[in-house]
């Protein structure tokens, strides 16, 4: 069936919260329904399109702005976009949201206590941050501003990835006749 609805799912949270894990699972779930999806992962963007950016507050805001612009282009091309990046600042997320029509920007707060994220530390970044090697690391040397009213709030320390995906899927603006298996 023809896909009618496109939107962006914007996963935000500290490093190690589970954004990439959930983004990949969500993509699999939507792909299985025959929907056209595109995943914008923060690490991939930082190694490509945004490789010229550092980690100053201004550069972090620019990272979010560029990602929102790419997401908008992908939506215009008919894709459901899944963006997974820390995006630590409320004002920058708000500006990203403003690029999209009402109801097409679904903010997902991937919430985890900092100590849990540090214990997970899949990339070894928290250790480096605590040693001073990454002075502006989000959650340690730079603030992460929790979303005030995200469309979806999942807590990955208490909830399994599959339960988180089920919660996210319930909030997506999917047409009932789109991509039905």
Curated annotation (Swiss-Prot):
BP terms from Gene Ontology? hydrogen sulfide biosynthetic process; sulfate assimilation
Pfam families according to UniProt: APS_kinase (PF01583)
The residues listed in the UniProt record as binding ATP, with positions renumbered to this chain, are: 13-20
Keyword Nucleus in the entry? The reply is: no
Pathway connected to this protein: Sulfur metabolism; hydrogen sulfide biosynthesis; sulfite from sulfate: step 2/3
Which EC class, in a word?
Answer: transferase
Q: Which reaction does it catalyse?
A: adenosine 5'-phosphosulfate + ATP = 3'-phosphoadenylyl sulfate + ADP + H(+)
UniProt-listed InterPro entries: APS_kinase, P-loop_NTPase
**One Gene Ontology MF term:** ATP binding
Is Transcription a UniProt keyword of this protein? no
| Keywords assigned | ATP-binding, Kinase, Nucleotide-binding, Phosphoprotein, Transferase
Q: Which residues form a coiled coil?
A: none
Annotated active site: 87 (phosphoserine intermediate)
Q: Which family does it belong to?
A: Belongs to the APS kinase family.
Matches recorded under HAMAP family? Adenylyl_sulf_kinase
Function field: Catalyzes the synthesis of activated sulfate.
Protein known as: Adenylyl-sulfate kinase
- Identify the species of origin: Burkholderia ambifaria (strain ATCC BAA-244 / DSM 16087 / CCUG 44356 / LMG 19182 / AMMD) (Burkholderia cepacia (strain AMMD))
